[in-house]
Amino acid sequence: MKTTQMTAAEIAERTARFSALQPMSTMKDNERVSQAAKDIIFARKIMPIVLERTKNPFGDTAAIFGAGGLTMNISVCPPGQGPGLHCHHNTHETFFVLEGAFEFHIGDHGEQQVRLNQWDTFSCPPGVCRGFVNVHDRDSVLLTVITGPANARDDVTLPVVMAERLEALQPGVLPEFQALGLAFTAGLDERST
């Protein structure tokens, strides 16, 4: 079978250097949303490595674009921080702890928990709510890999309780997150949405 040869420029285009990774673009410069509100929904620092050129909650800043339905990023969370419950309906989300430790909350109300230490992995199937928090005494670092159909990256919903937490913290902020394509309907019967 014939193989493909890559030029030096093509190799450079498909290479990501950790030192050059940029924070996700969707919320980076949004001054209408407090850091505390961002911290409820996202890891404090998300650095996309690989993205598809489709609508997704991470924006359009990545080192590499297009990898056959794969999204990959590095998340850094300070102690006690991490994104709350959310659900990817069409994609698998797999987490690998690079440094520190995280506690994952799984289920519509986070009723199940699993702690991951350095080098541990949790793979969450589509349709399951999950959130996580850094339970270490210093920054923890997570590699996240999302797989599934390339056109299914805009598949994230959050439980109503997340909307309530946001509104209690910063009234009127929900439209900023809804503009990213996030809906606060996870766990609701489709007839009630």
Summary of predicted features, one role per range:
Residues 1-69, 172-193:
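A short, N-terminal "cap"/entry segment at the start of jelly-roll beta-barrel domains
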Residues 2-9, 131-193:
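Double-stranded beta-helix
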Residues 82-84, 103, 120-122, 126-132:
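Histidine-centered metal-chelating micro-motifs
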Residues 90-103:
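Glycine- and acidic-residue-biased ligand/ion/polar-headgroup-sensing regions
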